[in-house]
Every structure is written in structure tokens, then in C-alpha cells.
Regions:
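Conserved micro-motifs of the catalytic ATP-binding
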Residues: 24-29, 68-75
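Short helix-loop "hinge" at the ATP-lid/N-box region of the Bergerat-fold HATPase_c
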Residues: 91-92
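Short alpha-helical segment of the dimerization/phosphotransfer core of two-component systems
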Residues: 2-10
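Short conserved segment of the HATPase_c
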Residues: 123-135
Length: 190
């Protein structure tokens, strides 16, 4: 029934708004996080969800192993997983089956950067400045599931960890999202 569906949607929206408000001020549970493992686990979960729905885009991982893997980061492992999962899930949601989502990792100058690139619908240029804002939805995403809070949550999580987020997109071509986090220094590791 339509009323029940709308009530459930509003309940999820309120829950997400509470999460966002809590994230702004809550203390983080800091630990040494293997960000490559986090990315792998999130990509695998999104891939399995796509397969369960009858197919999704190909998800390819390019995480360095030699001469050394990505450094660990210091942070809340559950929150970092949520941020990475959300970006990969968005890329999958807005990319047709048969399309591609590539997840790449690199490390440079004390920063680990995770890039998620897709061949999805892209974000209109006019909508790019607001994508990290609460309740923001690109004009071409209307009618697709989502509350418009996911990227606001991602941005808040990454900023709370001392990092930054960035997006580039071309409508009808695809989107690239970068999550950059400081590596865990020797004083940060247990």
C-alpha cells in the first residue's frame, strides 16, 4: 500500500538524518584500519547484492600489492566501511548492467586515495556543487531509490577522519569520486 511505503521511506529518512546529526559530534572509535581490506569487502558486498538482483555492472578492483600494499589509516572501521560502501553502491546503482565500476587505490604524500569510477548516468554539471549536501539529489536521479543523504554521510565521515572528498562527472558518460584519508603514522598504530 502506498501509505505504508511512504511511511517506511520517511522512517528511513529520519533515521538517516539522525545518523548525520550524530556523526557531526559523536566521538570516533579509532583503530588501525586496513583500508584495502575495507574497500575489498565493500566492493564484494555491492557485487553480491547486484548478483542477487539479477545482475549489475562489473566491479573491478585495482589496489596495489607490490612493491607494498596501501598503508593503513587510523579511524572508525565501521564508519569508513559505510563511506566506501556508499560510494561503490551509488556507482553500481547508477550504472547499467554490463557497465563498469572501477575502484582504485593509491598512496601519495601521506594520503591514501580511493577512487570509484563508473560508466553510469553521470551527474549534471549544475548539480555537482550540491552533491555533498543533505537531501541533495541530481535532477537525473529523481525517481530512483535513495534519500539524498548518502553522499552527505560520506562527506561527513571522511571529513571527521581528517580527509577530503571530491567528484567529477559528465552526464551520460560517468562519474569519478575520490575519498582521500591520511595514512596512520607510527604514533597512530598500536
Amino acid at each position: 500500500d502506498v501509505v505504508d511505503a511512504q511511511a517506511r521511506r520517511m522512517g528511513r529518512l529520519v533515521t538517516d538524518l539522525r545518523k548525520l546529526a550524530d556523526l557531526e559530534t559523536a566521538a570516533l572509535s579509532l583503530e588501525d584500519v586496513d583500508i584495502a581490506e575495507t574497500v575489498h569487502d565493500a566492493a564484494q558486498a555491492v557485487g553480491e547484492e547486484g548478483a542477487a538482483r539479477g545482475g549489475g555492472p562489473r566491479i573491478r578492483l585495482d589496489l596495489p600489492q607490490v612493491p607494498w600494499p596501501l598503508s593503513h589509516v587510523r579511524g572508525d572501521g565501521d564508519l569508513l566501511y559505510s563511506a566506501v560502501y556508499n560510494v561503490i553502491s551509488n556507482a553500481s546503482k547508477y550504472t547499467s548492467p554490463g557497465g563498469t565500476v572501477e575502484v582504485r587505490g593509491r598512496e601519495e604524500s601521506g594520503t591514501v586515495t580511493i577512487e570509484v569510477a563508473d560508466t553510469g548516468i553521470g551527474v549534471p554539471q549544475a548539480d555537482l556543487p550540491a552533491v555533498w549536501s543533505e537531501l541533495a539529489r541530481a535532477g537525473n536521479a529523481r525517481g530512483l531509490p535513495g534519500s539524498g543523504l548518502g553522499l552527505a554521510l560520506v562527506s561527513t565521515i571522511v571529513r571527521r577522519h581528517g580527509g577530503s572528498v571530491r567528484m567529477a562527472s559528465r552526464e551520460g558518460v560517468g562519474t569519478r569520486v575520490w575519498l582521500s584519508l591520511p595514512v596512520a603514522g607510527p604514533a597512530d598504530t598500536p
